[in-house]
Amino acid sequence: MKILFFGPNGSGKGTQGAIVKEKFGIPHIETGVIFRDNISRGTDLGKQAKDYIDQGGLVPDSITIPMILDRLKEDDCKSGWLLDGFPRNLVQAQELGKALEKEGINVDIVIEILLDREIAKNRIMGRRLCVNDNNHPNNIYIDAIKPDGDKCRVCGGELKTRSDDQDEEAIDQRHNIYYDTENGTMAGVIFFKEISAKNNGIPKIIGLDGRPGVKEVSEELMSKLRGTSLNNPIT
């Protein structure tokens, strides 16, 4: 089961990716982790990426995509993988598609969490961190995990915010890239949808309503994955 996973910041994409990883026993691959791993191991690609990062630049696709391909060829990816956070735009989607095809790697499923931009932004700005345990979920805009006043809903501890969660300009910039249907991330999603339409539904496109809570979204996702011939959960 080889999956590309899309969703805007604030959609819970990372949480759902972790659930898929646990359920199906496939690695949840994120580009940031790939960069850090290559840099820490001192690979040729890692050294090249570090030069760009140290200068405050973006790592070019000519480095990022080979890193991703190397990761997808590792032993733990033989039974499948979930790629999260790439591609981020149409050009990357096109280049990744070409590279995967050249390597004989097929994408089986494209998952897209659908969420209105305003809701996604509110969810980011509504996040609250418990000083006792960051894993205690609190969000002033999500009823299921709304804090108890100004206290943690789980333990009653004090709550704080992350500065980047309150940076509206940064949030808007990320969302500008994601919601751009001409050149941005959503344009990349459309690219893979067009491939699916021309290729008898391969890759399979799964759209998820991101408005409900984590449990409901996960149940919808598992239900749709069970409808594929690639479903092989470990539990």
Which residues make up each language-model segment?
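Glycine-rich phosphate-binding loop of ATP-dependent small-molecule kinases
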Residues: 1-235
